[in-house]
Design a protein with these regions (language model features):
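Secondary-structure transition/capping motifs at alpha-helix termini
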Residues: 24, 64, 86-92, 115-119, ...
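N-terminal glycine-/serine-/threonine-rich beta1-alpha1-beta2 phosphate-ribose binding loop
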Residues: 1-69, 75-93
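Rossmann-like dinucleotide-binding domain that binds NAD(P)(H)
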Residues: 151-237
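Glycine- and other small-residue-rich loops at beta-strand/loop junctions that grip anionic moieties
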Residues: 46, 72, 98, 182
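Short beta-strand segments
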Residues: 45, 125-128, 207-210, 228, ...
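A contiguous active-site-proximal alpha/beta segment in oxidoreductase catalytic domains
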Residues: 20, 66-68, 74-152
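Tryptophan-centric aromatic hotspots in well-structured domains and transmembrane helices
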Residues: 12, 50-52, 59, 68, ...
Length: 246
């Protein structure tokens, strides 16, 4: 590791100190554009809020860096396609941060399945039940932590007043910056089902139903959702992923 970038100065100082405690000296940046000018950086890991993923990845490949970007790779489908275009144009590597894909045990199970040793698989179903606490409800704009450069935090997202109790992490549960647990957790179940089935392309038919139930809070993304899709070129097979956190 040669550098760390974070728009929260407190977080940045803390992580730099952790590196020092282990005998590692790193450069510290609050602006990713400055980080990408650093010639000592060959590869970057992007673990920002979702709304920053695409722009950070595209800037990185344009700067000649390879990229490991946390899931979801992008905030929406269009952004994801732009990342692919940029990576191909600049001949850089962009890897999606899906830790399940790096599990040797899971990879062996996928191979076992694809070899037909369980017969023809007609349906794959992924389930996750994980209760999350309400993020609360506020009556108006909240103060942004003093250590945060809010302009840089918002980046490509609209710069709007903070309308929830907590800036960090709870960005997952509002649409301008997050995707809810569809992109935070359900993506693992959907990806595993597609991997197991060996899907070569996007599904021609997808049905998703859900909503935000149980809480009256400042969250806007679903906390309960079901996704059903038919794998491409296989109308007789289907995969399903269901997420519930209520």
């Amino acid at each position: 590791m040669v550098a760390i970038c974070d728009v929260d100065q407190q977080v940045l100082d803390r992580e730099v100190q952790k590196c020092k405690n282990q005998g590692v000296q790193v450069a510290a940046y609050t602006d990713i554009r400055k980080l990408l000018e650093d010639r000592n950086v060959d590869v970057i890991t992007i673990a920002t809020p979702n709304h920053w993923h695409a722009l950070a990845a595209i800037w990185a490949v344009q700067a000649g860096k390879d990229v490991y970007v946390e899931k979801p790779v992008s905030h929406n489908v269009w952004e994801g396609r732009k990342i692919v275009e940029a990576a191909r144009s600049h001949q850089r590597i962009v890897q999606a941060g899906m830790q399940i894909r790096s599990s040797s045990g899971i990879a062996e199970a996928v191979q076992f399945l694809r070899e037909g040793r369980l017969g023809k698989i007609l349906r794959a179903r992924g389930l996750c039940y994980k209760r999350r606490e309400s993020i609360g409800k506020v009556g108006g704009p909240q103060p942004v932590p003093f250590s945060v450069d809010y302009d840089l935090w918002c980046g490509p997202a609209p710069k709007e007043p903070l309308m929830r109790k907590q800036l960090h992490y709870d960005w997952h549960w509002v649409w301008p910056t997050g995707n809810g647990d569809l992109g935070n957790q359900c993506i693992h179940q959907m990806d595993l089902a597609r991997w197991m089935l060996g899907e070569p392309a996007l599904s021609p038919r997808v049905l998703s139903i859900g909503g935000r139930f149980g809480y009256e809070d400042d969250g806007t993304t679903p906390n309960t959702i079901g996704v059903n899709k038919s794998p491409p070129m296989s109308p007789d097979r289907e995969s399903e992923s269901f997420w519930s956190e209520s």
